[in-house]
Amino acid sequence: MPMPMVELFRGGLLESVHVGDAAAVDQEGRIVACLGDPCLKTFWRSAAKPIQALLPYISGAVGEYGISDEEYAVVCASHFGEEIHTRAVLSMLGKAGLSESDLSCGIHYPFSKKAANALVSAGAKPTQLHHNCSGKHTGMLMTCRKMGWSTEGYFLPDHPLQKATLDIISEISGVAKNEIGLGVDGCSVPVFYLPL
């Protein structure tokens, strides 16, 4: 059962309590501290991004295409759709001979209010570059290009890229591939269902 983790006070009075489950493990994977159920299964969602970002590095795409540390950081995380982020995504796509039209992450307004307001003020619409997962998707596309895999359908579970990603998730988590549940994340790629 989830445990209280955060209490919010307003004017000295308890306004709300947020519950959750958490686990801390050592380098051997042994649970050293927990709240609630440390074996609770959940979708990793964006918490998987640093692991998903290993493939562009391991495949050699990061080196081959001259990806800077700043650009690679956008592959590893969710971003706010600010110009610094969209520029990095566009730069990486160009370095790998790709374009925004190769992305399949979808479109939404930037999470940054300033960036979203700037688009509205300019009468412009958001693009896939503004999607908070466009960096991750760019990393996936660069990996496909480097490995000689088709970029078509790179987001589908049976694509070689997603199979390789599942292999890495299994290896790092210590959970067998056939025990990892799959769903579809909000940006169209597989999302992994594993214990905390």
Question: At which residue positions do the language-model features occur?
Answer:
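Beta-lactamase-like hydrolase cores
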Residues: M1-C39
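Generic secondary-structure signature for well-ordered alpha-helical cores
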Residues: Q27-R30, A61-V62, G94-L98, K146, ...
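Glycine/charged-rich beta-loop-alpha catalytic/anionic-binding loops adjacent to active sites
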Residues: G29-C39, E71-Y72, V120-K125, A176-D185
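Active-site SXXK
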Residues: W44-V62
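A generic, well-ordered mixed alpha/beta core segment in the N-terminal half of proteins
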Residues: E70-H137, T143
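Active-site helix/loop module of the DD-peptidase/beta-lactamase fold
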Residues: A77-G81, H85-A88, T165-K177
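Short, charged, amphipathic alpha-helices and their helix-cap/turn boundaries
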Residues: H108-A122, P160-V175
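Active-site-proximal helix/loop microenvironment
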Residues: P126-Q162, S170-L196
